Structures are given as structure tokens and as C-alpha cells.
């Protein structure tokens, strides 16, 4: 049996052109925030969801109102789970009717501290961020790819 070992280089100097979709833009913003903003982002989507994400990552408030931005809710829920501090993430009345239980359960399985403030399974959420304790979870195969991607983005922040 052949064994292959892949190791990351110390640094990568390159430019990557991505389309400016809201999902790619929001994921790039989260990855950049997790990496202490080490790269310059250009060509981000100008949609409301991306503007909400930029504001949420930069304003430093303990309560984050993502309005109706579903991608921001999913990516920020995972992001806040691994960043120090206690924050509340909320949104519009409609956002508070959109389920997020599958993602919250997966993050809790990794050791995240997330509380439902009003109704179980739905925003708003109180999240206390810290390094996650586990590195293995199970997800149903039919969940949103944004749930999966937000969990993958958090992988380096597990023990």
C-alpha cells in the first residue's frame, strides 16, 4: 500500500479570483476573520447578506443583528462558537422562524456552548465561544451545504 503525506507550506503567496456570490463572499470573510485578517479581499458580493456579514465581523458588539441574512446566520453561528466571548445573534421575525437546530446540534457535539433564547431550534442564540473539544461529528446527508461548510471552516479550532 502506498502512503502519501501532504504537508502545508509555511506561506503561500498567490492571488485567487473567485466569483462574487454571497455564499463565497461570506465564507471568504469568515475564513479571513478566523485567520486574523491576513489577506486582502476584493470583488466581494454587494448583496445585503455580505454587507450584514462585513458589519457583524467589524462592529464588535455583543448583540449581532443579521436581519434576514440566512448565510450570515449559519456562518456566524459556527464562527462565534470558536471565537472568545459571549454574544447574541438574532435577526428579523422571519429569521427567528428559520430552523438552525441541525447546525447547533453539530456544534454542540463538538463542545460548543449555544443556547436558544426564545424557541428551541431557532434563533436568536446566545453563543459562548472557545476552542472546541472534539473533532468528530455526524451530519445527515441532506443538510444545507452551508452547515457543512461552516463546520469545515471551524476545523482548525478544535482540540
Predicted regions, residues:
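Structural preference for solvent-exposed beta-strand-turn elements
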Residues: 1-159
Amino acid at each position: 500500500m502506498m502512503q502519501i503525506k501532504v504537508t502545508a507550506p509555511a506561506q503561500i503567496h498567490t492571488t485567487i479570483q473567485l466569483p462574487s456570490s454571497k455564499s463565497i463572499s461570506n465564507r471568504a470573510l469568515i475564513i479571513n476573520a478566523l485567520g486574523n485578517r491576513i489577506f486582502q479581499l476584493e470583488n466581494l458580493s454587494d448583496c445585503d447578506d455580505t454587507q450584514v456579514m462585513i458589519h457583524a465581523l467589524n462592529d464588535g458588539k455583543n448583540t449581532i443583528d443579521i436581519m434576514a441574512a440566512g448565510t450570515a446566520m449559519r456562518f456566524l453561528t459556527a464562527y462565534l462558537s470558536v471565537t472568545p466571548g459571549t454574544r447574541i445573534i438574532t435577526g428579523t421575525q422571519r429569521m427567528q422562524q428559520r430552523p438552525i437546530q441541525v447546525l447547533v446540534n453539530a456544534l454542540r457535539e463538538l463542545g460548543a456552548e449555544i443556547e436558544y433564547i426564545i424557541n428551541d431550534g431557532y434563533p436568536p442564540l446566545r453563543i459562548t465561544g472557545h476552542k472546541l473539544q472534539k473533532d468528530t461529528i455526524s451530519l445527515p446527508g441532506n443538510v444545507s451545504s452551508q452547515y457543512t461548510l461552516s463546520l469545515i471552516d471551524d476545523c482548525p479550532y478544535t482540540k
